[in-house]
Amino acid sequence: MAELPTTETPGDATLCSGRFTISTLLSSDEPSPPAAYDSSHPSHLTHSSTFCMRTFGYNTIDVVPTYEHYANSTQPGEPRKVRPTLADLHSFLKQEGRHLHALAFDSRPSHEMTDGLVEGEAGTSSEKNPEEPVRFGWVKGVMIRCMLNIWGVILYLRLPWITAQAGIVLTWIIILLSVTVTSITGLSISAISTNGKVKSGGTYFLISRSLGPELGGSIGLIFAFANAVGVAMHTVGFAETVRDLLQEYGAPIVDPINDIRIIAVVSVTVLLAISLAGMEWESKAQVLFFLVIMVSFANYLVGTLIPPSEDKASKGFFSYRADIFVQNLVPDWRGPDGTFFGMFSIFFPSATGILAGANISGDLKDPAIAIPKGTLMAIFWTTISYLAISATIGSCVVRDASGVLNDTVTPGWGACEGLACSYGWNFTECTQQHSCHYGLINYYQTMSMVSGFAPLITAGIFGATLSSALACLVSAAKVFQCLCEDQLYPLIGFFGKGYGKNKEPVRGYLLAYAIAVAFIIIAELNTIAPIISNFFLCSYALINFSCFHASITNSPGWRPSFQYYNKWAALFGAIISVVIMFLLTWWAALIAIGVVLFLLLYVIYKKPEVNWGSSVQAGSYNLALSYSVGLNEVEDHIKNYRPQCLVLTGPPNFRPALVDFVGTFTRNLSLMICGHVLIGPHKQRMPELQLIANGHTKWLNKRKIKAFYSDVIAEDLRRGVQILMQAAGLGRMKPNILVVGFKKNWQSAHPATVEDYIGILHDAFDFNYGVCVMRMREGLNVSKMMQAHINPVFDPAEDGKEASARVDPKALVKEEQATTIFQSEQGKKTIDIYWLFDDGGLTLLIPYLLGRKRRWSKCKIRVFVGGQINRMDQERKAIISLLSKFRLGFHEVHILPDINQNPRAEHTKRFEDMIAPFRLNDGFKDEATVNEMRRDCPWKISDEEITKNRVKSLRQVRLNEIVLDYSRDAALIVITLPIGRKGKCPSSLYMAWLETLSQDLRPPVILIRGNQENVLTFYCQ
């Protein structure tokens, strides 16, 4: 346990107001022994502060678990509490280490650092806490709101008609099928909402944080739009009822259509005013609407028990009758909508309102409790009400009635048909002529007619429609506000601003109002409803899929406290929601899915920088893990060989050409790892290692290079590369090729660095790697051109100064991207391959993969091989035959018969002058002196080594002459890398070979040597 000296008085409560001070944390004093536990001070065990260094009675900066350490935010005016970092607990305590802790503290606002304390008591803040926003419980905030949104105009005006068409049995099936979808969705949303702290944004917040910004953003936008259109639908339903009343009393305003528009616009304006008054007033209005609906229900039920008057009897109401109930059990389809799915499509929108409570999640006291409890209770009670009304009204009212008081049964006036005959009424004439204006199947206002006092039903219609419209208005603005704050789409941030203590989305209300007015102009309920239903169903499908996907990923982060859900039920809910979308209105379903896909593709293209820990991310990990483990069971086969490259880039932005070259042929094909060795003491380079890794990865992503970045700390370069070659990769996904840049300054650099460079190539062969060395005429390192050497992020040791740990890794991403030859079109040039020695085919495979890419596809590939002048035709045919079996598409083959001729004298002398400074000149020295010189300078070339390697040295000089003759204008030159035997070829001689081989060549030169194992085959198994 980390301990600190007791520097304050133990009993002084005023000093125990924080966890620790920076000065105490970084004190260089020797720690004192742990303080003994004092039972007279129980606060030692209960006080959350460790400023007095008392945790379980010990003198330590280690802290006990507390809520604040895991919270992302604090209450207004309260300081943020932080736990000590790992460095705080186990690093040396000294003043020089202050910069190690600065990052942890400086990120907080200045008001959180009071009097040098890391944290203080909330009561010490001089700022007065702002007024608390209004928060609602599960009844007022969720259940009532959901019930009001579920109940709507269909309950009063269409449910009796649906019962008459489908019969009581099928109506119950329609209701229960609809409730099945909403109940499964309710269970799914309950699970999602209890898997962590829920903020404002409702359905959008839940889906986006579960499935990610791609699907979440698209569904959030259309869900907000659907709610805005829902305002229009419900107000139009309200306006239709008012218009009918005006016409009944002979007081129309203008004409039927414009009356609806006028009434609806006035109504939605009043609802806007209620919303702008704040959530508190909106909630009061909802409670008032709820009471009105409850009174209307009671009024209806009482009315069914009252014996019918003559007026009601003439309209088909006869109170509870068994024969009426039996007759209305079976369907009687009429009209164009007279089908099961026709009735289902009309009823289903009345079940969609279960998200009203979740949509104001930011205004709930405890969303994790309120959303599941309130939503499921709302579904239960509204289902009971639908079933009860369908059964009761189907037991009281016949399907057809004339409404004429004189249509009583009169003896001698012919046959009387129908159940009404037994009750003294004859509706035969209007039934046969299909001219009845009343009855369950003809009169939409049947509930008003049956009720004890008709105006109360009208008031219930008003309450149901206006409350639903108000809930939709609030939901649209709240969801859209959260979407705007996340900035997933352009040009909408303006509407995200909140006002007042509740952060009311005033601008969102105005936008929803404008959309509602635009759709109110349509003034046709049957045109508006299908679009909304499909958007809501699309939301339900994604909510259920979110729950299913989060469950199957087995992510440790999926721990919902609501356990009464099932992943397969959630999947069924998602599928059935999509099916219902097409059953309701196929064209509206296609529109909804098309909009979702368009918005989805936009967010995928933009790649917003958000990280919400979505189940999609967890699923990606699961897939990667599963396939990676599965690869362990796959035996290696030549046909499945892929060039998996470990590229020694250092900081990738230093050598963009090297990154682009490898990234071109490995893209969507194989593994690429950019390796970076930080040289120096582990303690010194560790802060830099932690800071820059993420920045380099983002740089690669910005450059559209599909690669990993891996860095290690080592005492020297060679040891670091050895670590990378042994540890990089995972399972079968391990590098098999080492790619390095050519050491251009080898003649002027310290010989030890050259020794390390060549040693790295030898190590690669020892680890059975292939080797690829890339040389460009202008060099690979662009750090000086970018002036990166003055930035400690890029190379902190370059100026010989200690790197500061305070570095902004975003500088790596924001820097200007250097362009390279591998990013441009190559045109109709050539890729020349000098396949001088058989390395297993890697020298052929890399250019082939490069030639498949669009920028290199127009290049003609030429293959050059060595041969004898008297066997040129035979050798050429043999190579062409071999290449055709490899199916590489290489048809132009050139034999080099003069490869073993002596080079020109001036070129030979140039080579000798190149190695002269590195010669040991041991011809006249004794053996002891030579051995000592060799031990001190292993890179030196002895006379014996020059003699033994003379033929090989002259071959490199001659090859350079040949390449200059044939490939001066090529786009790329690929040459088999010569190998120097360990212990027989000094590093300086080997570097001279590579220098000579690629000297004066204008195109990029790639020196490749495989590990002498086949990477190409012409067999099919």
Curated annotation (Swiss-Prot):
Q: Name one GO molecular function term.
A: sodium:potassium:chloride symporter activity
What reaction does this enzyme carry out catalytically?
chloride(out) + Na(+)(out) = chloride(in) + Na(+)(in)
Result of changing S475C: In GTLMNS; 40% residual Na(+) uptake activity; increased MAPK1/3 (ERK1/2) phosphorylation in response to IL18; no effect on localization at the plasma membrane
Q: Region (Scissor helix): which ranges?
A: 615-630
The places in or outside the cell where this protein is found are: Cell membrane; Apical cell membrane
Q: Which residues cross the membrane?
A: 138-167, 168-189, 221-243, 256-280, 281-303, 339-360, 372-393, 454-477, 508-522, 528-544, 568-587, 588-599
Sites where Phosphothreonine occurs are at T46, T50, T55, T60, T124
Q: Please tell me, according to the UniProt entry, what happens when changing Y540A.
A: Abolished sodium and chloride ion cotransporter activity
Give the primary localization class: membrane
The free-text domain remark for this protein reads: Interaction between the cytoplasmic N-terminal and C-terminal domains (NTD and CTD, respectively) is essential for SLC12A3/NCC transporter activity. Phosphorylation by OXSR1/OSR1 and STK39/SPAK may activate SLC12A3/NCC by facilitating this interaction.
What is the protein name stated in its UniProt record? Answer: Solute carrier family 12 member 3
Q: Which organism is it from?
A: Homo sapiens (Human)
